[in-house]
Amino acid sequence: MIFTKDEYLSRLSKVKKIMDQKNMDVIILTDPSNMNYLTGYDGWSFYVPQGIIVALDLSEPIWFGRRQDSKGAKVTTYLQDKNIIYYPEDFIQAPPTHPYDFVSSFIHENNWANKNIGVEMDAYYYTAENHYRLTSTCPNVNFSDATLLVNWIRLIKSENEINYMREGAKLVEAGMMTAYENIKPGVKQSYVAGKIQNSLIGGNEEINIGGEYA
């Protein structure tokens, strides 16, 4: 994980405080950035339904997604194994079943079927079908919009986050310097791009972090 468990728990506490103020017992987050912010989850798995569930009565978020992607959740998050759940493979692109039928069942199993639940209505990966599955199978839930709830909290950076951003800026500087030094008449564009990518991901001896895939 990029940050400590204490950092993630501090973020979770802030989110729960706002949830309580907005009378939300549970929120379902599908924005990959918000999933990462609260758990550390990092994976290109948003091609299928996935998300995290934050509940006032649970000490940790719940990650849900495809079974094969759950391994990534175990590697990149601080969550206990019991809080990483996955739907069966035969729920994927197999109407009339749908991954959010699994989410709906989880809501009922945890006695949230009469609670106030927030969802990110304007999140790119929260589809109309996702919402329909929830509202049709959880008719007694009071659903409300939690779009930007976490995003506004993310706006105020901790000291650890600021330090990480400063290290990231050094990577950008290294990439720009590499471009400046290698862009010349007659040099192939692909050669320069490779050099830049190497700097952005590999960094140098002065940079404490390494870049990620781009």
Model-derived features with residue positions:
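Active-site cores enriched in adjacent His and Asp/Glu residues with nearby glycine-rich loops
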Residues: 3, 18-36, 125, 172-214
